[in-house]
Amino acid sequence: MAGRGCGCSPGHLNEDNARFLLLAGLILLYLLGGAAVFSALELAQELQAKQRWEERLANFSRGHNLSREELRGFLRHYEEATRAGIRMDSVRPRWDFTGAFYFVGTVVSTIGFGMTTPATTGGKIFLIFYGLIGCASTILFFNLFLERLITVIACVMRSCHQQQLRRRGAVTQDNMKAPEKGEADSLTGWKPSVYYVMLILCLASVAISCGASALYTTMEGWSYFDSVYFCFVAFSTIGFGDLVSSQNAQYESQGLYRFFNFFLILMGVCCIYSLFNVISILIKQTVNWILRKLDSGCFPPCQRGLLRSRRNVVMPGNIRNRCNISIETDGVMESDTDGRRLSGEMISMKDTNKVSLAILQKQLSEMANGGPHQNSASSRDDEFSGGVGAFAVMNNRLAETSGDR
C-alpha cells in the first residue's frame, strides 16, 4: 500500500464506516441548520403568545378576584383533562370501538398523533407488546408495497420504451420474441431512470395530498394550507397531533368520510414512504460521491485510496464509475435472492459484520422450513450485498445494486 510505503497512512478506513460517519456528520449539520431556521421563524411568535397569555391570565385574575395560584391550579386540572381526551367542544368518544380503531391505526403506522393515549397501566403494558408486533408488520407491509409499486412503475415505463423503440424501428417483432440474443438487443440492457420513478412518486403523493386537502377543507373547516400541512405531517408519520382529522362528534356522510379518511391516509403513507426510500438512494449516492472526492482530492498522493472499497446496496465497488441510476424491471425480491443463498451451515461469527439482515432472515426461514434451496450458480460475494429493509427490496433493481455488474 502506498500509504504505508511513505509512513504517513493511519490505516485503511472501511468504506461503510466512512459512509456512516460522513452521513452522521451531514445529518448533524442538517439538524443544526434546521434548528437555526425554525428558531428564527418561531421564537418571536412563541414569546408574543406567552406574553399575551400572561396578560389575559392577570386580567382574568383581577376581574374575578382570584389569586394567580388558584387559577393556575384550575388550569392544570384542565390540562390533565385535555390529555385524557376531554375537550370543550363536542368530540367523538376516544375509546369506543371506532375511536380505538383509529388509535391502533396511528400506533401501527407510527403516526402517533398523540390526541389519544392509554391512561391505565394495563393499556400501557398492552401497547408495548401490541406496538412491537404491529409496527414491525406494518413496516413489512410498506416494504412489500414499495417492491410492487416499483415493479409496476418499471414495467409500465419499459412498455412505453418498447412502444417508443417500435415507432423508431429499432425493435422488430422478431427480436421482441427473442430476448436471448443478448445485450446487443435494444431492450435487454435498458432500465428506467430512478429520477423518473422519483418524479412519478412525487406526482402521486402530490395528487393524493391535494385531493385529501380538498376533502379536509370541506369536512374539517381547515384552511387549504393547513390541510396540506396536515397531509404531509400525517403521510410522513411525523404526527404532531396539532391537527387531527375525523375527531368531531358528527359529520355529514360520516361513514363515507371516515372511510375515505382512512383510505387516503393509508395511500398517502405508502406513497410518501416509497418516495422517502427512493430519495434515500439518491442521498446515499451523493454521500458516495463526496467520499470519492475526499479520497481522491483531499488526501496527499501517499494517502489516496485509504477508503477500503466494499460492495454495497447502492454503489458496489466494481461499478463505482457509473452515474446513471436506473431500476430493473425483471423479477422480484424473492426470485432475485434465490441464487444467492448460503449452504445449510450457520454463518461464522467472523462474517457477521458483512451479512445483511435480509439475508440472515431468509436463512433462518429456510432452516425452519427444512433447509435452503441449493443453487450451483450462487457466489459468496453476492450473499452480502442484499441490504436491509427498503434497500433489500430495491436490491438488483438499481444499476448500482446489480450483482452482476
UniProtKB/Swiss-Prot annotation:
GO molecular-function term, one example from the UniProt record: metal ion binding
Pfam families on file: Ion_trans_2
Biological processes, Gene Ontology terms: regulation of excitatory synapse pruning; regulation of NLRP3 inflammasome complex assembly; regulation of resting membrane potential
Binding site for K(+) 4: 110, 237
Entry's localization field: Cell membrane
Cytoplasmic domain ranges by topology: 1-19, 146-193, 284-405
Glycosylation sites: 59, 65
Alphabetical list of InterPro entries matching this protein: 2pore_dom_K_chnl, 2pore_dom_K_chnl_THIK, K_chnl_dom
Residues given in the record as K(+) 2 binding sites: 111-112, 238-239
Transmembrane parts of this sequence: 20-40, 125-145, 194-214, 263-283
Organism domain of life: Eukaryota
Protein residues bound to K(+) 3: 112, 239-240
Catalytic reaction list: K(+)(in) = K(+)(out)
Intramembrane segments: 95-115, 224-244
Topology class, membrane: Multi-pass membrane protein
Residues annotated as binding K(+) 1: 110-111, 237-238
Record's keyword terms, sorted: Cell membrane, Glycoprotein, Ion channel, Ion transport, Membrane, Metal-binding, Potassium, Potassium channel, Potassium transport, Transmembrane, Transmembrane helix, Transport, Voltage-gated channel
Subunit structure: Homodimer. Heterodimer with KCNK12.
Function: K(+) channel that conducts outward rectifying tonic currents potentiated by purinergic signals. Homo- and heterodimerizes to form functional channels with distinct regulatory and gating properties. Contributes most of K(+) currents at the plasma membrane of resting microglia. Maintains a depolarized membrane potential required for proper ramified microglia morphology and phagocytosis, selectively mediating microglial pruning of presynaptic compartments at hippocampal excitatory synapses.
Family: Belongs to the two pore domain potassium channel (TC 1.A.1.8) family.
Protein name: Potassium channel subfamily K member 13
Gene (UniProt): Kcnk13
